[in-house]
Amino acid sequence: MGVSRRLSEHTNERRTTINDANDKVSAFPFETYGVDELESVLSSVGKLWNFDIWFVHGATGQSISIVAKYLFAKYELKTTYGISDIVIDTYFQTLEKSYKNNPYHNSCHAADVLHTLLYFFTQSNYASSLEPLDMLTSIIAALGHDVGHPGLTNRFLVNNREEVAIQYNDSSVLENMHCSKTFSLMGKKDCNLFEKLSNEDWLKARKSIIEMILETDMSRHFEILGRFRTRALVLSDLNLDNFDDRVLIFSMGLKCADIGHSAKVPELHEKWTKLVCDEFFNQGDIEKSRKQPVSMYCDRDHADIAKSQAGFLKNICIPLFEVW
């Protein structure tokens, strides 16, 4: 794509070692595994493609909170933006508790998406272009991109005239709700991560997070894919010095990360596939109980998971990853 830009001196000066970050992680209660073992695992966040977030959740009972705390320390976001440990802990613990106990759209999925997004950014040409604000907004967008998800699709919510669909005028219902919750949580006591941002950075951060989350709406998939393909491959004019282009690139990165498990080892992909199917089937059961038509992929009695996954990989995942 020809996008290249040196990381600012400010970023280089503030980058910390993994050991520094590990000191911050040790504050968490580890019940199953030792601190040293978990610190070693966390050092793979954003680095090891097939990192399994379920290990962290199983060991600590947390996923969002512990990964966020580790990354805020690693990239010195606390120091850069004057964010206290209390605010970091309170916001991300509140965010994690705001996720519902869905089979798929849960806090583990959010943390896994963040890991995958950071892998895309830090293990690619984008690494030399990342600025502290990019890291801050990417972490928040990834961890908040499904907060409050009810385990039901936009179409279901609209068809059943659910309150959230009424509130957001049937348009990207869930994604708008996720954005709103991500920001509204900052209004709670000891939760304002952006309290000391300049007005310019606050506006940039808000726009980035909103756009990144809204673009995870699969009904917008082919529109953003076509737009990105045109800019990246046809015109070859994406410029990371341009803020709107940065937002487009980060939005595409989050889209890819959102379905990133489809390109990981079979064990991980099959685990996530089973979970999303379980969630779909739960919706199908509700539709059956209401005598409504069962949505596509939601009928557990007539499911062909292998066929549906083959189509998903061929028509959605592969074209997306090829452009990215």
Question: What positions do the PLM features span?
Answer:
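Internal amphipathic alpha-helical repeat/solenoid segments
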Residues: 76-102, 122
